Amino acid sequence: MADNKAPQGLLGLLQYTPTTQPYPRVTPPSNRRPSTTPNSQDRGRPRRSDKDSRKHLYADGLTDGEDPEVPEVEDEEKENQRP
């Protein structure tokens, strides 16, 4: 007669699998911290063309190629009149 601890056949193999996992436990994706790669949030957006990347914002808020609307001639004249 067969042992009760190790039954025979395919059903026995299924029941007798060891409970300890032979590989380290993998953390589920919900516990992983979100990726900080810069591309992760920009997927699906078209790439900037070279023309857009060359246009660059200055400190006064004007982009490259725009003329300032307020002429600064008065300030230069005042500076030149100082002794």
Swiss-Prot record:
Q: Where is the composition biased (Basic and acidic residues)?
A: 42-58
In this chain, the stretch annotated as Disordered covers 1-83
Which UniProt keyword terms apply here?
A: Early protein, Host cytoplasm, Host G2/M cell cycle arrest by virus, Host nucleus, Host-virus interaction, Modulation of host cell cycle by virus, Phosphoprotein
Protein location: Host cytoplasm; Host nucleus
Comp. bias regions, Acidic residues: 63-83
Post-translational modification here is noted as: Phosphorylated by host ERK. The phosphorylation triggers a structural change that enhances keratin binding and protein stability.
Sorted alphabetically, the Gene Ontology BP terms of this entry are: symbiont-mediated arrest of host cell cycle during G2/M transition
Biased composition, class Low complexity, residue ranges: 28-40
Query: A cellular component term (GO) from this record?
Result: host cell nucleus
Transmembrane segment boundaries:
none
* Protein function: Contributes to multiple aspects of the viral life cycle including viral genome amplification, suppression of suprabasal cell differentiation and egress of newly formed virions. Induces host cell cycle arrest at the G2 phase by associating with and preventing the nuclear entry of host CDK1/cyclin B1 complexes. Inhibits cellular DNA replication by preventing loading of host replication licensing proteins MCM2 and MCM7 onto chromatin. Within the cytoplasm, associates with host kinase SRPK1, a splicing factor regulator, and inhibits its activity.
The family note in this entry says: Belongs to the papillomaviridae E4 protein family.
Q: What else is known?
A: The major E4 form is first synthesized as an E1^E4 fusion protein from spliced E1^E4 transcripts, such that the first few amino acids of the E4 protein are derived from the N terminus of E1.
Q: How does it assemble?
A: Assembles into oligomeric complexes. Interacts with host CDK1. Interacts with host SRPK1; this interaction may favor expression of late viral transcripts. Interacts with host cytokeratin components KRT8 and KRT18.
**Stated name of the protein:** Protein E4
Q: Which organism is it from?
A: Human papillomavirus type 1
